[in-house]
Amino acid sequence: MKNNNNKSSSSSSYDSSLSPSSSSSSHQNWLSFSLSNNNNNFNSSSNPNLTSSTSDHHHPHPSHLSLFQAFSTSPVERQDGSPGVSPSDATAVLSVYPGGPKLENFLGGGASTTTTRPMQQVQSLGGVVFSSDLQPPLHPPSAAEIYDSELKSIAASFLGNYSGGHSSEVSSVHKQQPNPLAVSEASPTPKKNVESFGQRTSIYRGVTRHRWTGRYEAHLWDNSCRREGQSRKGRQVYLGGYDKEDKAARAYDLAALKYWGPTTTTNFPISNYESELEEMKHMTRQEFVASLRRKSSGFSRGASMYRGVTRHHQHGRWQARIGRVAGNKDLYLGTFSTQEEAAEAYDIAAIKFRGLNAVTNFDISRYDVKSIASCNLPVGGLMPKPSPATAAADKTVDLSPSDSPSLTTPSLTFNVATPVNDHGGTFYHTGIPIKPDPADHYWSNIFGFQANPKAEMRPLANFGSDLHNPSPGYAIMPVMQEGENNFGGSFVGSDGYNNHSAASNPVSAIPLSSTTTMSNGNEGYGGNINWINNNISSSYQTAKSNLSVLHTPVFGLE
């Protein structure tokens, strides 16, 4: 009983020391720090917001330097064995201040509130005491105590001990006072699954999916060779691009069977490739790989189903080519209107250069292999090669005055090619001179001379043909003898020009040339003579290989 009286007397003396001089007057609140780290718990009768207190007392406890130890959920044991204040009680204690603790109160620069408070308004927040009227501290607080109080207030904001708008105000204090020990609660963003380099893009062996086009490509690693400066033995062989994955897998299987035989590992059973195994026996590795590429959907534009045939990208016609012959990388065989004709041209060239082992588009039994092998032409007369006897292109025939004593004034120079016919004779194209001035005679307008009774009409035909019965298509034109023209000069007759021709066939051979020069200063007509070159006949070629006669069309004859 005596002990209780002593307690009440000490409590009343403590309350009287903390009471303000005038509770109704407005005055400035000021901040004071506790001298120790003891938690002061007060009676709920002095403050209705306090949830649980029986008597005013304080109990000492050691200072906590940790963030979360001060706000542990386990109650703090008092000295007398009664449980301490729970975190919910601390929330109720902090709700005394409707505005919550502000930065101005810590720094002392802001205006204080003038709200009339009850007599006892002392709160303990992590060692910081808010009071309306307290005695000045006996000594200034240490730096460790200030730092500890700040850490506890910041930790209280993280743990949600402030209610409502109080937590937002404390968080603003936390932003202005950064804490290096604050724990970030932001969850890490999940990383995207990125395909690693070298990851398989197909379930089949030797097949990869192109990352841009989306097509499937088949590749084979040929380890039978090693290039210079290459660390890894072998090379990658491209087998083509395909729209379907299984087609690319079949291409790999066929190439693997060709390279390594039937014991290799394939995507599909070997029994599916019985016909292909027979075909690949007659091909080399390079040829078989080329055939696989041509069958792929990713082959170059204008591809044909036949070997050695491509489509021209401009005019759309089909071209035939054969590779790696006669030291050439690519030999052009011609342009054709259909794929089949171009394929036959390739087959003939392949038989010519590679014999019976040639890979052809059609069955080799349809071709006469012996005649093709003995023929000098690679494509059966479609592409004639000039022989050494006929290879004298752009040959110049110069008729100077020294050739004949009667040729004194004119000088005719013809640049012509001299093809040879089947009978060994030489034939020439004929250029026709035309006088531009009008004349009464029709033939004078055509052939450019006046009527001459001494002129002899002779047929213009090829050597070895019937001159008296010319075939249709041959032109009959008058040929002037030497010295019988009206130009004031002399032309070359049959005797002076064709020295190698037969004497019984005195046929004129005035050649048609792309370049014809005539120098004559004494012309009977008083005008210039124009030579019309018939270039149509020079580009005309017969379809049959045994006919090499080039007909000269004469316009104006019906």
Swiss-Prot record:
Top-level division of the source organism's lineage: Eukaryota
GO cellular component, one term: nucleus
Residues in the DNA-binding region annotation: 203-269, 305-363
One Pfam family named in its UniProt record: AP2
Tissues in which the UniProt entry reports expression: Expressed in roots, seedlings, inflorescence, and siliques. Also detected at low levels in leaves.
Location in the cell: Nucleus
Gene Ontology molecular function, alphabetical: DNA-binding transcription factor activity; transcription cis-regulatory region binding
Region (Disordered): 1-65, 74-93, 166-195, 387-406
Key word Nucleus present: yes
UniProt entry keywords in alphabetical sequence: Activator, DNA-binding, Ethylene signaling pathway, Nucleus, Repeat, Transcription, Transcription regulation
Single biological process term from Gene Ontology: leaf phyllotactic patterning
Chief location of this protein within or outside the cell: nucleus
Biased composition regions of type Low complexity, renumbered to the chain: 1-54
Function: Probably acts as a transcriptional activator. Binds to the GCC-box pathogenesis-related promoter element. May be involved in the regulation of gene expression by stress factors and by components of stress signal transduction pathways. Involved in the regulation of floral organs size.
Family the entry assigns: Belongs to the AP2/ERF transcription factor family. AP2 subfamily.
PANTHER family: AP2-LIKE ETHYLENE-RESPONSIVE TRANSCRIPTION FACTOR, AP2-LIKE ETHYLENE-RESPONSIVE TRANSCRIPTION FACTOR AIL5
Protein name: AP2-like ethylene-responsive transcription factor AIL5
Species, as recorded: Arabidopsis thaliana
